[in-house]
Each structure stands twice: as C-alpha cells, then as structure tokens.
Amino acid sequence: MKMMDANEIISFIQNSKKSTPVKVYIKGSLEGIDFGPSAKTFITGNTGVVFGEWQEIQAALEANKEKIDDYVIENDRRNSAIPLLDLKGVKARIEPGAIIRDQVEIGDNAVIMMGAVINIGAVVGEGTMIDMNAVLGGRATVGKNCHVGAGAVLAGVIEPPSAKPVIVEDDVVIGANAVILEGVTVGKGAVVAAGAIVVEDVPPYTVVAGVPARVIKQIDEKTRAKTEIKQELRQL
C-alpha cells in the first residue's frame, strides 16, 4: 500500500479546479435555453433536471427568468477542491452514507460501514472493516484485516506536511470511540480498548486502555477470542 505524501496532497488541493455542482429541477418554456458548457440537461417538454456548475446555471436562470416558471436547487458543497471517490470499481463492501474522498486507497474485501468518513490520502488495507461513524483523517493508514470500531478517530495529518501520520499495522482491533493521535503507530496484532486516547506508539500484540492509553497486558487467547475478525463479513 502506498502512502500519499503531504506535499502531494497540498499540491492536489491547490491546483484542483474548485467546484460548486448543483442539480436544478426546473419548469417553464425551456427549449433553446443554454445552461452553460458544463451542464447536462434531462428535459422533456416544459419540465426537466439540469446538472452543472452553479456559476453557469445561475447566469442562465437570470438571463431566462421570463421563460422559467419555477425551479428548485439542490446543492451540497461550495468551491469543493476534492471530489468523492468513484466507488464503481472498488472491490470492497461500501454501505450507503459512507463519505470517501478521492485519492483514498481501499483494499480488496474491505468493509466501509454507514457514516464512516475517510479523508484524502488515507489507506484501508485488504479485509479491514471501518465501522459506523469512524473517521480516518488525511493520510491515516490502516493495514490488513483490522477492525476500526464505531466512532473511532484516526487523526489526520496534512499540515504541517512534516508531521507523521497515524499508522495502524495489520491485524489490529480498535474499539469504539477510541482516538489515535497524530504520529502514533499501532503495532501488529494490538488491541486498543473502547474509549482509549492513544498518544504514543502501541507495541505489537499488546492491549492498551485508558486516557491516556497505557499497556495493560499482552495479547492472550481470551483476548483473541473476544476480538476475532470474521472473514464471512468480508466476502463479496
């Protein structure tokens, strides 16, 4: 898995064409109206839907207001620099309501649950589950066969660009509402208890808990049984 450099992300955002896309439901004498070069129109008779950039469509609405009886505008962003990831080719299970930005890498058979938010430059390894309402900040990297619990936060690092991102190695389980701060590495096979706030590196095959998180024991058979990763949930 690759990790996107912070300066690459900054350059990507800086140089991207900022976008304010809208969807307009419109009614009126619409024949011959030019809604702008970026617009896609789906018009039948005197009603239709127009997709495009607000600046262009706004100008068309104003210029043709005498022909237009009514319209409703849907808009969910303003001068957005980063589009959402095109999910159609991703070999993973991604549930409705997940928000995944472009330039995110998602491994095969990963699972992204409802309400999860994954920012630019993040990496999700093969077979890893990101549970409901979890947040992966910019450049956060999660290895293979992990579970990031509901409401957990892996802090993002884009600025300052020299800062080290969160790295979660393979086979890690992170409990609900845990927080992993910038620069922390969670070692292979470790378990982070629910609600823990992790401010320093976690050794492999240990269990950490508390605020701030501290090692409370080594992984044992009882812990493995309680934190087992079920491959059946990752089948496509």
Curated annotation (Swiss-Prot):
GO molecular function: tetrahydrodipicolinate N-acetyltransferase activity
Name of the protein in question: 2,3,4,5-tetrahydropyridine-2,6-dicarboxylate N-acetyltransferase
Catalytic activity of the protein: (S)-2,3,4,5-tetrahydrodipicolinate + acetyl-CoA + H2O = L-2-acetamido-6-oxoheptanedioate + CoA
Function description: Catalyzes the transfer of an acetyl group from acetyl-CoA to tetrahydrodipicolinate.
PROSITE patterns found in the cross-reference section: HEXAPEP_TRANSFERASES
Organism name: Geobacillus sp. (strain WCH70)
InterPro entries found in the cross-reference section: DapH, DapH_N, Hexapep, Hexapep_transf_CS, Trans_hexapeptide_repeat, Trimer_LpxA-like_sf
Gene from which the chain derives: dapH
GO biological process: diaminopimelate biosynthetic process; lysine biosynthetic process via diaminopimelate
Pathway given in the UniProt record: Amino-acid biosynthesis; L-lysine biosynthesis via DAP pathway; LL-2,6-diaminopimelate from (S)-tetrahydrodipicolinate (acetylase route): step 1/3
Enzyme Commission code: 2.3.1.89
